[in-house]
UniProtKB/Swiss-Prot annotation:
The record marks D58, K82 as: Interaction between pentamers. It is found in: Nucleus. This is Nucleoplasmin. GO terms for molecular function: chromatin binding; histone binding; histone chaperone activity; importin-alpha family protein binding; nucleosome binding; RNA binding. The modification N-acetylalanine is found at A2.
Length: 200
């Protein structure tokens, strides 16, 4: 299936097309590939369902994806269907980049694979924005170096010995006055007062 994408803007929405193929005794393989287009679009095929046709025999039908890795062929089964047990399977999370080959490994079909073909225009604007961002970052660093650093906060001097003693005397006097005002305690230890602090 061919897709058309207009180049009216750089940030165009992706074009999504319904895609499907049939595998049977005569056509056991199908290759999904896209033609090189002038606009350099990124293509993906998201599989949705694999189902058997109404004329399928009551036998196991196994469909697999065939890939070429380092010159060696590698196959991955994606569904095993049988009309009396499981005539249809829903595919979730299988997104493939073309070219992709589907093969009917076992069974005679007909077996139908459907999905969504998405074509997105490659967006190189992020590279331009990144270059601009780096240039702006360098300018900001230079401006920061030109500015003087703010003056450091001056610490308050520590309390002197005389100030500490005066504060201690004041607290002692408050303790003595609060003891005189408080009512007498009953029970164990009643009548025992607190010894006044020695005066220095």
């Amino acid at each position: 299936m061919a897709s058309t994408v207009s180049n009216t803007s750089k940030l165009e929405k992706p074009v999504s097309l319904i895609w499907g193929c049939e595998l049977n005794e005569q056509d056991k393989t199908f290759e999904f590939k896209v033609e090189d287009d002038e606009e350099k679009c990124e293509h993906q095929l998201a599989l949705r369902t694999v189902c058997l046709g109404d004329k399928a025999k009551d036998e196991f039908n196994i469909v697999e994806i065939v890939t070429q890795e380092e010159g060696a062929e590698k196959s991955v089964p994606i569904a095993t269907l049988k009309p009396s047990i499981l005539p249809m399977a829903t595919m979730v999370g299988i997104e493939l980049t073309p070219p992709v080959t589907f093969r009917l490994k076992a069974g005679s079909g007909p077996l139908y694979i459907s999905g969504q073909h998405v074509a997105m225009e490659e967006d190189y604007s992020w590279a331009e924005e990144e270059d601009e961002g780096e240039a702006e970052g360098e300018e900001e660093e230079e401006e920061e170096e030109d500015q003087e650093s703010p003056p450091k906060a001056v610490k308050r001097p520590a309390a002197t010995k005389k100030a500490g003693q005066a504060k201690k005397k004041k607290l002692d006097k408050e303790d003595e006055s609060s003891e005189e005002d408080s009512p007498t305690k009953k029970g164990k230890g009643a009548g025992r007062g607190r010894k006044p602090a020695a005066k220095k």
